[in-house]
């Protein structure tokens, strides 16, 4: 029996998205979005100067290299990372999306804006993956993936799905902690 790997890859992510993530994000409030569970969290915050990352009225905290240990992050930061570093950059590099980067992205200032962007980027990613046939999944990722340029696209797709599952789980845990705080 032949296996349609593109369908398997998208079905796995769609199941996770539709049954474990998307509906659990419904009703996310701005208070939850910006909640800092500990002092010193990385987050998305109102811009104070033009030299901060991003464009528009909000910026995101980040540093290269990342500090050790990395700071605890807010839901706003996690969603910003998913939008730019996980989905947006790969949509731009591999599926014809608009260029995107931490320094140039207009970070969402509300939970509703972030979830709208997440829905849009998720749909673009899945649509892009659905264009990959067996040969497309086997071809090298190319220079956009730096030292992983020679890895097959299937490896990148699996990595992005793992990242999306991982970071969305963190977002949902933060939401649970917010709801259960004393």
Show which residues each predicted segment covers.
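Acidic/histidine-rich alpha-helical segments that form the ligand environment
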Residues: 105-138, 155-165
